[in-house]
Amino acid sequence: MKKVFLDTNILLDYGQQRARHEEAETIFCLGDIGEIELYASYLSYANMGYILRDMEREAKYALIESTREGITVLSCDNQQLDAALKQQVKDYEDMLQYQCALAAGCDVIVTNNKKDFYEFCQLPFLTSEEFLLQFDYS
């Protein structure tokens, strides 16, 4: 089964019903029916808390909780932090996300902000639309 790492923006697309909500919802559904395994970093949930800081508290926590179902949340250890620091890339947060995905043995990263991943990512990284187009539904 394919291990799919979801970047923060995919979680937000799903939870906030943003422009790419339907794609994110389809990816979550594929996880729900056992076609793929979904992973995200603990950092994504910290990022979401910060991004949504101006929301009403109850609504913010409900939104974050709505993105938790069916997701294996990955932690980050000393080795991953050190690897990210060593790379000295432009977007340190994306490098931390990548290190979490790599350590978990994820097969692909799904992100709707690919630009910073080009600098370093050795795993396939696809937008939600690209992921769904290449997914074998048979």
Give names to the regions the model predicted.
Residues K2-K3, G70, L102-S138:
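Acidic, PIN/NYN-like endoribonuclease modules and their adjacent C-terminal/linker elements
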Residues T72-K115:
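Active-site neighborhoods of divalent-metal-dependent phosphate/nucleic-acid chemistry enzymes
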